[in-house]
Amino acid sequence: MTDFSAYAVDGLPLNAPDFSKINEGDYIAHIKEAIALARARFENVKNSNEKPTFANTITAMDNCDTELDQVLSVFYTLLSAESTDAMQDMAQEIGPMTSEFSNDIGLDPTIFARIDDLWTRRDDLGLNNNEMMILEKSWLGFTRNGAKLGDADKDKLREIDTELSKLSPQFSDNARLSANAFELIVTNEDDLSGLPENAKTAARETAEAKDHKNAWCFTLEYPSYIPFMTYTDDRNLREQMWRAFSSRAFNDKHDNQDAIKQIVSLRIQRAQLLGYDTHADYVLERRMAENFDNVDAFLTTLDTSARPAAVKDLNNITAYAHKNGFDGVLKPWDMTYWSEKLKKAEYDFDEEELRPYFPLQACIDGAFAHAEKLFGVRCTPIDGIPTYHGDVTTYEVKDLDGTMRGLLYADFHPRAGKRQGAWQGTIRDRDTNENGDVELPLVSIVMNFTKPTKDTPALLTFDEVETLFHEFGHALHSLLTDINHGAISGTSVFWDFVELPSQLMENWLTEPETLNMFAKHYETGETIPTQLIEKLRASRNFMKGWQLFRQVSLCRLDMAWHTLDSADGIDDVINFEREAVDDYTLLPYEGGCTSTSFSHIFAGGYSAGYYSYLWAQVLDADAFEAFTENGLYDPETGQKFRHEILAKGGSRPPLELYRNFRGRDADPDSLLRRDGLLDD
């Protein structure tokens, strides 16, 4: 009998896992044993002679796969944040194993008959609101995943799901390996003219760590790539970096083009097998947007304002570049560089001026102080919690009255084995165990921030501070839920609602009241100067049209892939992509491919859902207006958001939750108003 105790240790706070006692080589065996245990328990539920009730069916089923959930949550946490080649190989085996198990349960006619019986009698069962939502979610989970199909179609669905379970981790791994394979080695410091000293120091230390003597090493990790593209005067070097970044997993040994064609084809087949015309139709049925027509109309509305603003932004940058010695047509590797120079000229502001005021620890403390002031929750470092890497810090999260809310694991810097980007993960949702005890959430926030150097602490860019607040907002959604059922607690909400708490948090970062809480010079302790905040605020809508237009184009690309009703015509990924975004191409096409590294939609759960970021931006812009109207830290407004949005998870439809908070629907113009894109 396998001992699963390391995944939930009795002697640790909140039964946290002990990563030090979990051996990489045991995952496969542990998952097989956990699946066997779960199967036996599901058989007991299935073969019960008792009339179905919520307790003996829904609750009983929720408790069948406890060990499997524990092992998988740890495995997938590490697969993203602390992976190895062996784990990537395991993922190719684990995906089909868990897919087969899920389908064995989801397609079992006897199990579904019990769920269906409860659904038919739902109004006579005396269920409370939460139980009704859980029953509905369970019934839809079965029906939307093939429970009503005939045997032959069920077999076909199994084949599709097995293949998809292999392809998504393969796509993600290819993107990671392709990015990691690139290095730009510079041996002449004169070639780095324009680059800030802190970026050069970091590149020097990276080179030393990689045994490149007397050199500077630049990679495609964001803390290296973005400063390089923003400040390096050498246009040829910028071009090299841009071409590498824009060609991740494209026409190299980690190429993702075949994976994309397979994923898209299988998603179409799956949707049509389940009675939908397209994958987007299938996905959007369970979203606030409801259908593609609504998404299309939403994007068209944004496009109407973003397009002319983007053209204006491009014209302004082009004129400025020509005025200052640039000759010719701007290329993609020129935009960030010249836009930064134009911002400096127009606002006398360089975001690098902010960096000394954003040492990482102060920013962490600031995010925590912000949450305490806004929502009445306190985060405190806690010792003795085993972590999966020395970079990871743990915090206990409590209400001000001492009520425990959960544990937060924070992991901030790039390293080999960690994928790019930033994300919030869940090691355990808030839930109720088989003994009826509430289990509190274990949540992680994982990022790839600028590293400390030998001489300075990690000093963040403003974008990185926004990312910290964003991911912490997701974490608060998980930690502050009051729902004791994992299926509807925390971030278990519609995908186009889940970004509201995270994006809302970013709004405070241009407010003096918030910045003065934590933005202090790492050497002198001086609070960030008022003049610098004013410059930040004055420049916050700089290039907003360009940025929004870019986001709309990515949404259109996502929808182009997922509104197909046949994959027969997709012979060439890049040709399909070019056609899909041709109307959004304002700069000359210079090669590369977005789709091959677009992990959000091919490996990250945002297929037919990338629009969710913009959809939620309308919500967060409107929600923040409630705080500007009532006071940035108005206790009543903060508590109302906590109790109507964060606490309730997916226990009610998101539109209902938002109306309860705001007293009305979100104003569709709120995003354009905030970004300065509404016509006067």
Question: What are these language model-derived features?
Answer:
Residues 36, 40, 44-51, 67-84, ...:
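Intrinsically disordered or highly flexible coil/loop and linker segments, enriched in small
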Residues 2-23, 29, 33, 215-217, ...:
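C-terminal, non-catalytic "cap/extension" segments appended to globular domains
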Residues 129-130, 134-135, 163-166, 173, ...:
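Active-site-proximal, well-structured secondary-structure segments within enzyme catalytic domains
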Residues 11-26, 75-94, 118-159, 219-258, ...:
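Short His/Asp/Glu-rich catalytic/ion-coordination signatures at enzyme active sites or charged loops
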Residues 257-268, 439-445, 483, 648-650:
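Short, hydrophobic/aliphatic alpha-helical segments
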Residues 67-77, 136, 140, 336-343, ...:
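Short, hydrophobic/amphipathic alpha-helical patches that form generic packing surfaces
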Residues 450-468:
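Short pre-active-site segment immediately N-terminal to the catalytic Zn-binding motif
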Residues 1-195, 627:
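N-terminal helix-rich structural modules
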